[in-house]
Amino acid sequence: MNKTYFLGSNTAYGFFGDFSHLTRGKTVILKGGAGTGKSTLMKKVNEIALDAGFMTETYRCSSDVSSFDAVFVPSKNFAVIDGTSPHVTEAEIPLVSGFVFNLLDAADEKKIAPYKDDINYAVSCKKQYFNDAYCNLNCANLIFENNKRKLSAAFNKAVASAAKDTFAALELSHGLRETRFVAALSDEGFVDFLSNDFKGLYTIGVRAEYPEIIMLYITKLLSLLAANDVEYTAFRSPFSPDFFDAVKVGNVVIADIDRLQKCDEIITLDAPVSLTLRTDLDAAENLHRTFVDKAIANIRLARLTHIGIEKIYSPAMDWTDVNNKTDKILCLLFDC
């Protein structure tokens, strides 16, 4: 069994990571830039762990959804993480709980040397594409936050009442409160693994005319859960990571109805909205979508540039050395 998350997301504040829980146990940190085989190594670790009967969590790259940024085996408290920018990670206690493997150790520098200027230029372009994406996402987020403030006044009572009703109906237990990214803004647009990961659980779909209303409801519900020391996993908004747009409490998942493949229960959040406010919100939504589309285009350009860098590094790699490192990492997992 596997669950899929993101290590972070491209947000209004730049890249925002959420993976501190992966470094609590035995942690393998991979170093090496583009084209060095980090993702392929993690896919192999994940495949072998699954074949051995372990449940795994895989963490995708928000700029390339097909690529792995981390793999975690919860029952072994064992993680392999891509420790390079923008999610730089270091070993807290080297060779005890943290193990660093640099996949570039045996690379042939002579094969890379002729392309140094090309690499520097490509890296500079890639950074600019991401900066442009974050600028557009910041503009989109300002619109979203302004809409949320406007809707808060109209929906505050309905949201508070619905959150209290949901809280009262849940089976609660005390424990850890954790956060994850289960959706992200990527080179493919908005990618969401929520429905894939929680099949078989009781699902509550929240229906509202505007997504801001659902976020207000989730915020109210999380406040009640936290005040009562209830265990939950909250899922960060891929655009505005200080806020949350879905939550799992025990065996119940609560999210926007459009994100769920099936719903066992539906909550409708409704309140009167004036024609003037509706007109303002619709115009703002169109502008918000324009900024998000521009951000996705920038992320896609950054990804294409990254592919170009990969093509330079990959032929210089010593893949026998990478395979040997993979075997050592598997020994750390299986205590051999």
Regions found by a protein language model. Name each.
Residues 1-12, 47-111, 117-118, 223-297:
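Conserved nucleotide-sensing/catalytic segment adjacent to the nucleotide-binding pocket
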Residues 1-19, 157-196:
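N-terminal pre-Walker A segment at the start of P-loop NTPase domains
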Residues 1-53:
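Generic N-terminal leader/targeting and pre-domain segments
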Residues 27-46, 188, 199-225:
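Glycine-rich phosphate-binding P-loop
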Residues 30-31, 41, 57-60, 139, ...:
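A cross-family "folded-core" feature that marks the main globular domain of proteins
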Residues 67, 83, 164-177, 282, ...:
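Rhodanese-like catalytic fold shared by cysteine-dependent sulfurtransferases
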Residues 118-171, 287-330:
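An accessory alpha-helical subdomain
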Residues 195-196, 318, 334-336:
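SAM-dependent transferase fold signal centered on methyltransferase-like domains
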